[in-house]
């Protein structure tokens, strides 16, 4: 992965030692990592930065992981969010899934598995964004054709010239 294609992560956990350890390990794996130790910090970071993937602790004081998940999804449509928890229940996993979580992993986590899931989440984000952009372009093309068929035909002929 080149420096241009680094996955940008938001890492959210109220356990500072855990947060520092996992952030350091992810940095060594060539991820860009921004950390937040509270839900409020996570939301503030998301207002200032565009993240590819977020890894969020489910159980935090103040604002719990489900509130953070919802707030992040409201701000960033294509952000994939992985929930981490030390107290997994079926109900909490279902709730997070309904709110749009990509995956729900239990602590203690397997670091190699976490890295794999982060990469899967990143790929899912790219795919969703690509599909959205593709639909958007198709809509623009349809509108362009309706409004100006000759303009679209000229544009398409230039595309054909570029492929030669």
Task: Tell where the protein language model's regions lie, with residue ranges.
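Acidic catalytic/metal-coordinating carboxylates
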Residues: 7, 37-41, 64-67
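Active-site residues of response regulator receiver
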Residues: 13, 57
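Two-component/phosphorelay signaling modules centered on CheY-like receiver
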Residues: 16-34
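Short amphipathic alpha-helix used as the core "switch/output" element in two-component signaling
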Residues: 44, 66-78
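Receiver (REC) domain active-site loop signature in two-component systems and cognate sites
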Residues: 60
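C-terminal output helix
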Residues: 109-118
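C-terminal output/effector regions of signal-responsive regulators
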Residues: 123, 133-164
